[in-house]
Curated annotation (Swiss-Prot):
GO terms for molecular function: identical protein binding; IgE binding; IgE receptor activity; IgG binding; protein heterodimerization activity; protein homodimerization activity. The lineage of its organism: Eukaryota, Metazoa, Chordata, Craniata, Vertebrata. Expressed in leukocytes and pinealocytes. Expression in the pineal gland does not undergo circadian variations. PANTHER family: HIGH AFFINITY IMMUNOGLOBULIN EPSILON RECEPTOR GAMMA-SUBUNIT, HIGH AFFINITY IMMUNOGLOBULIN EPSILON RECEPTOR SUBUNIT GAMMA. InterPro entries: CD3_zeta/IgE_Fc_rcpt_gamma, FCER1G, Phos_immunorcpt_sig_ITAM. This is High affinity immunoglobulin epsilon receptor subunit gamma. Keywords: Cell membrane, Disulfide bond, IgE-binding protein, Immunity, Innate immunity, Membrane, Phosphoprotein, Receptor, Signal, Transmembrane, Transmembrane helix. It is a single-pass type I membrane protein. The modification Phosphothreonine is found at T78. GO terms for cellular component: cell surface; external side of plasma membrane; Fc-epsilon receptor I complex; Fc-gamma receptor III complex; plasma membrane. The modification Phosphotyrosine is found at Y65, Y76. The chain crosses the membrane at residues 24-44. Residues 19-23 are extracellular.
Amino acid sequence: MIPAVILFLLLLVEEAAALGEPQLCYILDAILFLYGIVLTLLYCRLKIQVRKADIASREKSDAVYTGLNTRNQETYETLKHEKPPQ
């Protein structure tokens, strides 16, 4: 709401009419360009924070399984068949 009021007041000022069309367009393009850069930086910062939080939560969940190890034993063991003594 406030930016709209400021823009409206700037358009009412006599000096703003002296700019002409191309200069006003360049100013608006520069504002839009800076706005895009700021939004891109904020988006990248948010993605990095989410990724760090995800990695931290995975490390916490991996702590549950630290005591569990697979056995060094094959699934199928060979039977040791001994001949009965005669």
